[in-house]
Amino acid sequence: MATKIRLKRMGAKKAPFYRLVVADSRSPRDGRVVEEIGYYNPVKQPVEIKVDEEKALHWLTTGAQPSETVRALLKKAGVWQKYIAAREAK
């Protein structure tokens, strides 16, 4: 199963927030997910990003591919740098 870390859109019309989820790459954007690892609220000021580092690092090390947007959010949250450091330490 090819897994991706991507955003799942939630919320009302014109007031979106997103959950960072691990899903099969063939499932629809808002379809079934394997696990939720955080959320992103672009409407709130300042922008709110929460990521469960342990879960995110687990899925990244097992081969889950993040979307471009999720990769940018992981960089802002500081998780991506930890993943790169752990990968280079091996």
UniProtKB/Swiss-Prot annotation:
Q: Does the keyword Acetylation apply?
A: no
Q: Which family does it belong to?
A: Belongs to the bacterial ribosomal protein bS16 family.
Picking any one GO molecular function of the record gives: structural constituent of ribosome
In terms of domain of life, where is this protein from? Bacteria
Instruction: Look up the record and report any one GO term of the cellular component aspect.
Output: cytoplasm
> Mind telling me what this protein is named?
Small ribosomal subunit protein bS16
**Gene name of the encoded protein:** rpsP
**Keywords, comma-separated and alphabetical:** Ribonucleoprotein, Ribosomal protein
Q: Which organism is it from?
A: Moorella thermoacetica (strain ATCC 39073 / JCM 9320)
InterPro entries for this protein: Ribosomal_bS16 (IPR000307), Ribosomal_bS16_CS (IPR020592), Ribosomal_bS16_dom_sf (IPR023803)
Tell me if Ribonucleoprotein is a UniProt keyword of this record.
Answer: yes
Question: Where is the secretion signal located?
Answer: none
What GO biological process, any one, is recorded here?
translation
